[in-house]
Each structure stands twice: as structure tokens, then as C-alpha cells.
């Protein structure tokens, strides 16, 4: 199973990082409080769009050959994307922690660190890198979710909590999570079904901010999700395929938001 392999590899990677820089050193480097910028842009009127910076994935392999995180961030800065998701997972998604720092230099958009967080160390690290929010995946963390969620909040990060089924949703709601990401991709099989959002959204309280992730390919998909009550969408592969054509991506965003 790909997810198990990713988690095993990530745990080893974090242990290596701890040997190089102990968690105590990391905590001492933390500066700045809570900005709330990520949550704010998701809650504004109309549907919000999170554009992802992603070179590869286990299911698709290399998505963007001539990958340049700064160039992509500059495109997102120019079009009406509301936040940026930065993939930092190295082994399976060809990401890098430094992409967050690079993007932060050229973009004013709030940044979500997208990785497989398995250790509290990564939460402190995310804050130091300059992320405004982190992704916590219920299928990875299970009953550790509440502690990881509370720690993230305590260091000044918003938290996108990812679920894929009803059981995971209940865990997220019991932990008091205020931003729920419905992943239309099953991380066990990597199969995608955009109807996952429709099937689960009815169980989510109205005061929760809802993000739909994966399998979103057209402006029509986004308008459909908005009609269900989704507050934001996260788009990776679809944008990576057209990122070199700023007019095309700008038109896509305008049409998705109802202005095209």
C-alpha cells in the first residue's frame, strides 16, 4: 500500500532530521504569532481556490518536467488564486522544504505546507519554514489528530484536516477541527471520485470551512462543488498542466469563480 510506504519513509526521514537538529533547537527558532490569513481567504464570499505547487505524485509520476517553484508561485500571484499549497514531500512527490521559503519571497498568498505529517517535529518545522497552515491527514494520524491539531494551533498555524470517509470525519469533528478537507482520492488505492465530496458534505456542520481536494479538472467541477456548499477547492495536477499559459489559467480561475 502506497500510503503505508510513504508513512514509513517519512518517519525515517524525520528521525534523521532530529539527529541533525534536535526539536529543542527548532522550538527556540519559532517566531511570529497567528495570522489567520489562510483561514480568512477560505472564508471570503464565493469559492476560494488553492493552487498547488507539485512536481510529481505516486499515481502520475512526474507531472511537470521543467519544474520551477518560484515561476509557478509568480503565476499564482498574478491570477486570482487565493492561497498556495506547496508539496514538500521528497521521495514520492519530488517536493522540498525550501520551496516554502522560495515561494514566500515572491508571493503574498497564504501558504499551506502539504506533506505527510507523522511527528510533532514537522509542525514546528512548518512554522519556521514560513507556512501559514499545515495539512493533517486523519488516515495517517488516527487518534493522534487532536494533539497534533492543538499543537499546530498553539504555534500559530491554521490546519487543513483531511478526511476521505465518514469515520475519519467523525474523528476530525471530535477533535474540534474547523477546516475540513474532503479528499476525493482514496489514499489507500489512489482512486478518485469527485462525488466523495457530495456524499460527505451533508454530515459536516455549517460553521466548518470545507475544502474539496483531488480530481477537480474543470471550472464546471468547481461551480458544482460550490453549489454543494464547498468553501474552497485545492487544485494541483490540473493547474500544473497549464501553468505555462498564464491566460489559460487566468481564464480557468475567472470562469470557476463565475466571472468567465
Curated annotation (Swiss-Prot):
Known CDD domains for this protein? Answer: IGPS
Functional pathway: Amino-acid biosynthesis; L-tryptophan biosynthesis; L-tryptophan from chorismate: step 4/5
Q: Name one Pfam family in it.
A: IGPS
Under the heading InterPro entries, the entry gives: Aldolase_TIM, Indole-3-glycerol_P_synth, Indole-3-glycerol_P_synth_dom, Indole-3-GlycerolPSynthase_CS, RibuloseP-bd_barrel
List the Gene Ontology MF annotations in alphabetical order: indole-3-glycerol-phosphate synthase activity; phosphoribosylanthranilate isomerase activity
Q: Which UniProt keywords apply?
A: Amino-acid biosynthesis, Aromatic amino acid biosynthesis, Decarboxylase, Lyase, Tryptophan biosynthesis
PROSITE patterns, per database record:
IGPS
Name the UniProt record assigns to this protein: Indole-3-glycerol phosphate synthase
Q: What organism is recorded for this protein? A: Thermoanaerobacter pseudethanolicus (strain ATCC 33223 / 39E)
